[in-house]
Regions:
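ATP/adenylate-binding site constellation spanning eukaryotic-like Ser/Thr protein kinases
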Residues: 16, 37, 137
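Active-site-proximal cap/loop segments of hydrolase catalytic domains
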Residues: 69-193
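Non-catalytic accessory segments flanking enzyme active sites
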Residues: 1-32, 54-57, 61-62, 103, ...
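Short hydrophobic segments within beta-strands
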Residues: 24, 39-40, 120
Length: 193
């Protein structure tokens, strides 16, 4: 079995920001339209790389195109890029993933099937899948959340009281304060939808 090739690219998000992503296509793609798996990374302060990923390769081997978006808030693209994701779990970070999906399925050269698409993710990526299920349900046929965060406020509340004060301050700046930002966190949590 041949490995699929992953190609990195940049696209323009709906608000004009440049966002990095990568697309993996099956090694023996046929002429028929390919189903798509959108696979956001965990973290969210992490990133995907163009390198061997057993999950991506397995999906590609089974005939799926796999899109991985390094949404704002991802590490490795500079401090400003990472900071642009602060308190944006269900906002700009989510929109970047959706914009990336819309970009690739609208490219006629890629031959992707927008009507056969799924979001699959773990940890923060699972959160993206859950959030897509209530914010973007019209775009996808399935949502798979593996250990995804369904209640951001609850997560931050538990970390707020169990971690050192420096970590609490960092979490409040990056993700939100469980008390001060309660409404924002509740609105972006799948448990409330």
């Amino acid at each position: 079995t041949r490995l699929a090739t992953t190609k990195a690219f940049w696209f323009e998000a709906s608000d004009g920001e440049q966002v990095q992503a990568q697309l993996t296509l099956p090694p023996d793609a046929k002429t028929s339209k390919l189903p798509v798996i959108v696979m956001p990374h965990g973290g969210p302060n992490a990133r995907d790389f163009v390198r061997f990923d057993p999950f991506v390769q397995t999906f590609a081997n089974r005939g799926y195109a796999v899109l991985q978006v390094n949404f704002r808030g991802s590490s490795g693209f500079g401090k400003a890029y990472e900071a642009a994701g602060f308190k944006q779990w269900g906002g700009l970070m989510q929109e970047d993933v959706i914009d990336g999906f819309k970009q690739v399925v609208s490219d006629p050269n890629l031959n992707l099937d927008a009507d056969r698409a799924c979001v699959v993710g773990a940890s923060y990526g699972g959160y993206v899948a859950l959030t897509a299920s209530f914010k973007n349900a019209d775009l996808f046929q399935c949502f798979v959340s593996i250990a995804g965060i369904s209640d951001i406020g609850s997560l931050l509340q538990s970390e707020f009281y169990t971690r050192m004060s420096e970590t609490r301050a960092m979490n409040a700046a990056r993700h939100g304060d469980p008390v001060v930002d309660r409404a924002l966190l509740a609105g972006d949590s799948a448990i409330n939808h």
